Amino acid sequence: MDLYEVESKIKELEASYNKEADNLMQELNAYKKKSPILPMYGDDPNVDKMIANKNRIIRSQYTRRENKIHKLWEKFYDDVTDIVTAEYNLPTDVAKLVVQQVRDRDIGRSELASYLDHYAIFAETVLDAVF
């Protein structure tokens, strides 16, 4: 349960996820550039209806690509939970709570390991006292 080991594992994990997230973000930006939201003109209701339908399709594609990025980072935090479980010998549910507590603090990922260490040690102490 060395903070340096945990921090290096999380940084390696984050580097791989950052690379994938960058690719997904480039894909999203390329799609936004290729398919911008179309302006409504208001002259002809049929044309506006057609434009509104096209915009709905474009927005759904934006959302689909954005959701891919969100799912990627959710998987990152699941993997961080696995690291916390393994390194601190915590039950999975407790490790999930530790990671969620750190995420709720809305800190940058650069400070993630130190906060995880703090909360994981606290959780470990509580579990030792209870059991």
Indicate where each model-derived feature is located.
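Charged, low-complexity interaction regions
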Residues: 33-45, 88, 107-112
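Extended, amphipathic alpha-helical coiled-coil scaffold segments used for oligomerization/tethering
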Residues: 39-52, 56-59, 91
